[in-house]
């Protein structure tokens, strides 16, 4: 049986009020929407909830709220409960999923009823992309959740939250869906009683017709079909509007959306009524202000979300000016090192005798991939001790993690990846090899809060490498990282550039991004369109960025080696950072 872990906090005063976090509330809401599926057992994890707390109607939870189903997080025997942010979905005994949308999707996907699986949208892709990669998933899983959390922390609104305005604008956008022209033709050729018009009288709609001119409007959050996005957004927006006084009439499309869901079936409203205890609301007199909000799409693929005027275009003069500022640091920017990790070759035929035949990679590319893996595996082995927990961040289909599991049978290897399909492939290969020391976490890096001894990542894209290094510093864990996509570095709420105190003294963020941009000009010598002088400049910029990473780690108490993979031709992005935590600053 699958397990669903939700966080609760029981008040100490007479223990009558039961609270949960916003994300766990959404998972419980989905579970109740599915009518308490019999193949999933709910487990409540007693913890101190951070952020806003939602009071639950405990009368609806009598069946689940027994001592047998309540675990204390600090004393949990299951490591995943301490490793991941709640809610967590467990399946197959060694796979754990964190993240609101991913957990709610899995609740639906694991149901035998095929009709329910239609809630996952076309090809099961609704909210499939992780929040790091999808603005739409981030809106549902992060942005609106943060709004509700603040409201339940006592925030009094002066303005309608910007997220409400963004959703109203989203509902005014043209519908994006598969076969939209087919749907438009069917809609245009239906009679009032639902029948079809005669063939010669049919309205013709060409595929060259702009989508804005098609008479298809949003009924639901993702178009004309009720999906998991509606299940997640409905309780969030209902709660927000409870704190907005009489502001709903100012948002007619959102109001119509509420009505559509309520008329589609009262299940959402009923589940919300059964679970949610409204809090006492303090609203200022009069109407709330409505913030101005630029009309940008909530879909990543929509060209309206790209703002070319805001992008950084690096000129040679700006790059040279940024690099010249570093001269005062009197540092050597290079990756030359006496330490290398490519000498110990691995007998791949012994480890995975059939993988070369089944791999989709061409022979030469497979060889280069294996050389990359050898370097990282050897570096991790040089740091590992029996019993260590080792995390392969951004694991993809698990090539590095599986190699580590084979070479270090006395260590636990955590395979962490936010894409469900990739993690499924990793699990399949692990099962084929009979590995018993792998645990699989489907989640964003930020949802991992557990302890570990070594963190590794091979070509984690852009800022993801710096999030991995941040996780290692948090856990005081050794690290082995081969960075990638330097040009994709972007500041985030918890990551700012430059990283090290030394670089911060001489560079601002814009200077730093000029250098990072140029680091992506490093191509393999002799390849098409490769200018030697540009490639050498790109290699120098790679060394600058990775020296900044090295200095930041040294400031946190690490001994760090910056070297290159061997042979160096195995990848253009061949830098390797190996850090050993030695002291607490």
From Swiss-Prot:
Domain GST C-terminal: 120-275
Disulphide-bridged cysteine pairs: none
Family annotation (Gene3D superfamilies): Vaccinia Virus protein VP39
GO cellular component: cytoplasm
SUPFAM superfamilies per record: GST C-terminal domain-like, S-adenosyl-L-methionine-dependent methyltransferases
Pfam families linked: Methyltransf_32 (PF13679)
InterPro entries (UniProt xref): Glutathione-S-Trfase_C_sf (IPR036282), Methyltranfer_dom (IPR025714), SAM-dependent_MTases_sf (IPR029063)
Family: Belongs to the GSTCD family.
Name this polypeptide is given: Glutathione S-transferase C-terminal domain-containing protein homolog
Organism: Drosophila melanogaster
